[in-house]
Amino acid sequence: MSEMTPREIVSELDSHIIGQDKAKRAVAIALRNRWRRMQLNEELRHEVTPKNILMIGPTGVGKTEIARRLAKLANAPFIKVEATKFTEVGYVGKEVDSIIRDLTDAAVKMVRHQSIEKMRYRAEELAEERILDVLIPPAKNNWGVPDESQEPSATRQTFRKKLREGQLDDKEIEIDLAAAPMGVEIMAPPGMEEMTNQLQSMFQNIAGQKQKPRKIKIKEALKLLIEEEAAKLVNPEELKQQAIDAVEQHGIVFIDEIDKICKRGQTSGPDVSREGVQRDLLPLVEGCTVSTKHGMVKTDHILFIASGAFQVSSPSDLIPELQGRLPIRVELQALTTDDFERILTEPSASLTEQYKALMATEGVTIEFTREGIRKIAEAAWQVNERTENIGARRLHTVLERLMEDISYDASESSGQSITIDAEYVGKHLDELVADEDLSRFIL
């Protein structure tokens, strides 16, 4: 798991997300507390439970982006889910328990990748030997078995050197490789994904791993053999146990759009995708044991981060038990013109940099002036104020409209340089921004 300090985490988030310092600090502290807990003695460690977070803020201000970036920083099992995808137990649709199953699958994949990376050096050696056995078969004793007591021949060592230097990459050889597992597609109604996964695993296990001769270039064969040999060196049972432990101790679940499962006003009849889902989430957030195909997983120490815009509802519309299990509240602020200007220039892969790089592939050089960027930011802010406020996502719409002519003609304009200044932006956007009906439908 990540050993970054809160200040380092915030600094890393700052290079991708503008503003929202309170939210960044909250997730940075929560992530660091995961590491701090693991430094405690076992008795006290069991008592320290994570403080779950509720992020509140309008759409397009960075809630989901914080989750995406956090997933890369955490170096721990992480899953992002939409609250609207789930229904109450007993109804058609996904149950909330599938969150933990998916998290465990992600952990198994992560732990397997880490284990294979650790074994890569040994796997590379074994893969080399298998290729050399095809190129220069080893000497055999009187019983027809390869004689391992003999030193490798000078020819074999020469070929090994050539193989490592890449001189044999384009040479074709015939070698036995593990055949791809038999694929069995099973159609099942929604909510039955777990059953179909188990059936598919069963059919694959019945088929077993078979070796199949293939004619292939050495470069490709080496890649496949390294993966095959690394997989043999990994213990599947040990890997499953490590994955379950990683989920239980370091797992993070991000639940987006939680405001969409709030009960609004008094409604009669079953509310299978709102209050029912909240009730089903309670045991997961509080701590329970979920059965997965890899084993039983306890959720007591999994960190839950929920987020929602809460534009037509408020956090108090969540059922009281769930409110109590999300003790840390963080409010994200609506974006201003200055924020939009910073979003266009400061992040490491800002929108303006992306458009410059895209046009450079056609040989067109794009330059954004400071005044032009300010004008784009003002246009996006004005449209947000007059119509629906969709936050930073409005910049995508405005920029796409602004760049439409350049993008269309780029393939015939190789070698040109185009400067996007305040005058250029005004010429292409002023009419749309001023006309509320046009901006409502086009921007």
UniProtKB/Swiss-Prot annotation:
One term under GO cellular component: HslUV protease complex
Any one Pfam family match given in the protein's UniProt record, by short name: AAA
Localization, UniProt: Cytoplasm
GO molecular function: ATP binding; ATP hydrolysis activity; peptidase activity; proteasome-activating activity
Domain of life: Bacteria
Positions bound to ATP: I18, G60, V61, G62, K63, T64, E65, D256, E321, R393
Keyword ATP-binding in record: yes
One record GO biological process: protein unfolding
SMART domains: AAA (SM00382), ClpB_D2-small (SM01086)
Key words, A-Z: ATP-binding, Chaperone, Cytoplasm, Nucleotide-binding, Stress response
Main localization, broad class: cytoplasm
Keyword Protein transport listed: no
UniProt function note: ATPase subunit of a proteasome-like degradation complex; this subunit has chaperone activity. The binding of ATP and its subsequent hydrolysis by HslU are essential for unfolding of protein substrates subsequently hydrolyzed by HslV. HslU recognizes the N-terminal part of its protein substrates and unfolds these before they are guided to HslV for hydrolysis.
Assembly and binders: A double ring-shaped homohexamer of HslV is capped on each side by a ring-shaped HslU homohexamer. The assembly of the HslU/HslV complex is dependent on binding of ATP.
Family: Belongs to the ClpX chaperone family. HslU subfamily.
NCBIfam families hit by this protein: hslU, PRK05201.1
Name of the protein this chain belongs to: ATP-dependent protease ATPase subunit HslU
Organism: Yersinia pestis (strain Pestoides F)
Gene name per UniProt: hslU
